[in-house]
């Protein structure tokens, strides 16, 4: 049995709560301590909502799940919490698919589409680390997406998979090997790889995904007794120090004891008979025969190997659960855990819609004899099931929706920013002559060495406007979905570094463009009714100019819409509160000074301490072979992309090119000699 580590949350920050943060922290904590289930933090852009959340977690000292509506924002939150809580377990749980084509059937074409998927190994590793941390300790913060409500294996089975190894333990190499295999690790006769183990004489090495850092465990035995355990670098094999013991968990969170497989087989067979009889009774002989062939093949594979393709469709039988819903990430948390729903006005509707889409696809598979009805239970949670799993929740948004406002016991405003910055002034201008007017406003900002964001309604408009501005001598680039992730990050980096002055985009909300150098946001066609010009979207877009003391928003329109009017009124309300507060407290707003750098060097330095070499020595090749140098950098590049650390990925990509070029030159010189 694993005894959970009881470590307090330690918040590392150069700053103390300021502005509206102390009041917001106190009010939300009081509401939670009173036992209220729902509370809302209504915080403007740049008010430090993440820092407020961090303080609540630290003060209440409870495990926390923070959910966001996309991977990019989740990755940003993950990095922030990693910085705030360096001594605690901060984990990342998002979809591990780079490509996913679900199993489906199109009746109109009599077309069955097999499941196809490409799994991202690094994301999968982070998911394993998440459930491992939750099994081992309480000081855990998990940043996740909608993946948190999708089906997982039994948390009890996973916790029971834990095996401890310690110095002085009486155990043979064969027994160790059998345990590793039971936990789904594979033996390798080649170089040690992640999630594999090797045996050389009396030495066993294993590299588990569940551990943070690129290190493996080396177990040294003498006459069926463990005499030494070391941590060693997975790449250089350098000894990183001795340890008395370590606990190993299964390499998968879908742990299925073989006895469960044996118990499931007769249940599956029984349901197969019932469903085949149902088809026959309704004249569906083709469906009955199809189902019989498919399921009987799966049963044979389960008998022989304990596994079959699409085994998740039999999770209802294999889990041993009597619940009507599947297990999910929430089940791995203790009962007193806290939930924070970031950007709740977007995230909650996303969670609400997951079940229906999944159900309609699988219903076709069941109705046409491709799957048993039990396959419907391998699914995301229904919204009411999601709500039932919530212990206590804080909705976080600058623009909370009706649901958050109606359910919450308290809705706490966080309007005053610690920096004293106020919401931007808003000017409305008719669209007649808007291009000339926009060009004039851009020139004013360029003269002040400030930046501009322009939002349009279509990709074509953004490209045409960018071309128009470039022809006028403006340093501008467009930003939209046809650019890949690294290209988008490069464009944003160019803006921050003053290599361009203007970005033209469509949905600038999703890009995470909180850039302090931006002092002007221009909204074209601000009056057009639709998602990108709703009250909520307009308020969020206005916030892009809220990190600069000269922040200004210009809305170009033909006729002022209701959404425009509501967004302007709400922004002006907040702006007046902020101005009054600054006057009362003699505060002069100052633009946020955000250092233009990436976190590559810091992360690499941390990794260097673990794996035993310096970044500079990686480049010069003083510690590792040339092949391993490039392999290591490629590994870091893949990890950076998976973590959404795209600026780091760009630097790593360039380093790989640089190193490859040096190796190529060295080879050519060698040939000449």
Curated annotation (Swiss-Prot):
Q: Summarize where ATP binds, as residue positions.
A: 43-50
Instruction: Tell me a Gene Ontology molecular-function term this record carries.
Output: ATP hydrolysis activity
Q: Which residues form the Helicase ATP-binding domain?
A: 30-417
Motif Beta-hairpin: which residue numbers? 96-119
GO-annotated biological processes = nucleotide-excision repair; SOS response
- What are the GO cellular component annotations? cytoplasm; excinuclease repair complex
- Pfam families tied to this protein: Helicase_C, ResIII, UVR, UvrB, UvrB_inter
Q: Per the database record, which ranges form the Helicase C-terminal domain?
A: 434-600
Q: Which domain of life is it from?
A: Bacteria
Domain annotation UVR: ranges: 627-662
Keywords from UniProt, A to Z, are: ATP-binding, Cytoplasm, DNA damage, DNA excision, DNA repair, Excision nuclease, Nucleotide-binding, SOS response
InterPro entries associated with the record: Helicase/UvrB_N (IPR006935), Helicase_ATP-bd (IPR014001), Helicase_C-like (IPR001650), P-loop_NTPase (IPR027417), UVR_dom (IPR001943), UVR_dom_sf (IPR036876), UvrB (IPR004807), UvrB_inter (IPR041471)
In which broad location class does this protein mainly occur, judging by the first location in its UniProt entry?
cytoplasm
| Subcellular location field | Cytoplasm
Q: SUPFAM superfamilies recorded for this chain?
A: C-terminal UvrC-binding domain of UvrB, P-loop containing nucleoside triphosphate hydrolases
Domain text from the record?
The beta-hairpin motif is involved in DNA binding.
Q: Which family does it belong to?
A: Belongs to the UvrB family.
Q: How does it assemble?
A: Forms a heterotetramer with UvrA during the search for lesions. Interacts with UvrC in an incision complex.
Stated role: The UvrABC repair system catalyzes the recognition and processing of DNA lesions. A damage recognition complex composed of 2 UvrA and 2 UvrB subunits scans DNA for abnormalities. Upon binding of the UvrA(2)B(2) complex to a putative damaged site, the DNA wraps around one UvrB monomer. DNA wrap is dependent on ATP binding by UvrB and probably causes local melting of the DNA helix, facilitating insertion of UvrB beta-hairpin between the DNA strands. Then UvrB probes one DNA strand for the presence of a lesion.
Q: What is this protein called?
A: UvrABC system protein B
């Amino acid at each position: 049995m694993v005894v959970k580590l009881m470590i307090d949350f330690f918040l590392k920050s150069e700053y103390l709560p300021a502005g509206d943060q102390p009041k917001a922290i106190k009010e939300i904590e009081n509401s939670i301590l009173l036992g209220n289930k729902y509370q809302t933090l209504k915080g403007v852009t740049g008010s430090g909502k993440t820092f407020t959340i961090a303080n609540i977690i630290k003060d209440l000292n409870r495990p926390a799940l923070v959910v966001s509506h996309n991977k990019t924002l989740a990755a940003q939150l993950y990095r922030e919490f990693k910085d705030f809580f360096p001594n605690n377990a901060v984990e990342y749980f998002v979809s591990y698919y780079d490509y996913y084509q679900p199993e489906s059937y199109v009746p109109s074409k009599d077309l069955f589409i097999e499941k196809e998927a490409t799994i991202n190994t690094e994301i999968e590793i982070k998911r394993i680390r998440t459930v491992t941390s939750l099994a081992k300790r309480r000081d855990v913060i998990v940043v996740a997406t909608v993946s948190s409500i999708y089906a997982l294996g039994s948390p009890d089975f996973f916790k029971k998979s834990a095996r401890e190894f310690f110095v002085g333990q009486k155990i043979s190499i064969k027994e160790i090997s059998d345990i590793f295999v039971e936990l789904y690790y594979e033996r390798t006769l080649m170089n040690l790889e992640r999630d594999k183990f090797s045996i050389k004489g009396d030495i066993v090495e294993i590299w588990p995904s569940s551990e943070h850092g690129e290190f493996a465990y080396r177990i040294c035995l003498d006459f069926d007794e463990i005499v030494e355990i070391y941590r060693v670098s997975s790449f250089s094999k350098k000894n990183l120090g001795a340890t008395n013991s370590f606990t190993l968990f299964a390499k998968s969170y879908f742990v299925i004891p073989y006895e469960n497989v044996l118990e499931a087989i007769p249940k599956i067979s029984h349901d197969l008979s019932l469903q085949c009889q149902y088809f026959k009774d309704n004249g569906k002989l083709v469906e009955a025969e199809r189902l019989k062939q498919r399921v009987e093949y799966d049963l044979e594979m389960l008998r022989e190997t304990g596994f079959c393709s699409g085994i998740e469709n039999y999770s209802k039988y294999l889990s041993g659960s009597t619940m009507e819903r599947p297990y999910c990430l929430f089940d791995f948390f203790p009962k007193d855990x806290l939930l924070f729903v970031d950007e709740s006005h977007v995230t909650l509707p996303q969670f609400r819609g997951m079940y229906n889409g999944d159900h309609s696809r699988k219903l076709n598979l069941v109705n046409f004899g491709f799957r048993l009805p039990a396959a419907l239970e391998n699914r995301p949670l229904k919204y009411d099931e999601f709500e039932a799993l919530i212990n206590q929740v804080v909705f976080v948004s600058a623009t909370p929706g009706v649901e958050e406002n109606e359910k919450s016991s308290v809705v706490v405003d966080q309007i005053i920013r610690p920096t004293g910055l106020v919401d931007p002034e808003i000017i409305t201008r008719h669209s007649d002559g808007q291009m000339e007017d926009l060009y004039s406003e851009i020139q004013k900002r360029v003269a002040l060495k400030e930046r501009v964001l322009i939002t349009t309604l279509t990709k074509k408009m953004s490209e045409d406007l960018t071309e128009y501005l470039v022809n006028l001598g403006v340093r501008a680039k467009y930003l939209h979905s046809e650019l890949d992730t690294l290209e988008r990050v490069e464009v944003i980096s160019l803006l921050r570094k003053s290599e361009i002055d203007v970005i033209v985009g469509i949905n600038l909300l999703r890009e995470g463009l909180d850039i302090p150098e931006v002092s002007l946001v221009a909204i074209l066609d601000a009056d057009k009714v639709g998602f990108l010009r709703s009250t909520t979207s307009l308020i969020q877009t206005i916030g892009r100019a809220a990190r600069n003391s000269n922040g200004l928003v210009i809305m170009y329109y033909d006729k002022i819409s209701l959404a425009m009017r509501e967004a302007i009124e709400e922004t002006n309300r907040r702006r007046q509160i902020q101005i009054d507060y600054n006057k009362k407290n003699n505060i002069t707003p100052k633009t946020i000074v955000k250092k233009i750098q990436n976190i590559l060097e810091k992360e690499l330095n941390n990794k260097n301490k673990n794996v035993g070499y310096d970044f500079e020595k990686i480049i010069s090749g003083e510690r590792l072979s040339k092949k391993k140098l490039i392999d290591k950098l490629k590994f870091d590049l893949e990890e950076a992309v998976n973590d959404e650390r795209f600026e780091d990925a760009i630097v790593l990509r360039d380093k790989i090119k640089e190193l490859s070029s040096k190796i190529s030159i060295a080879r050519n010189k060698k040939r000449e000699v």
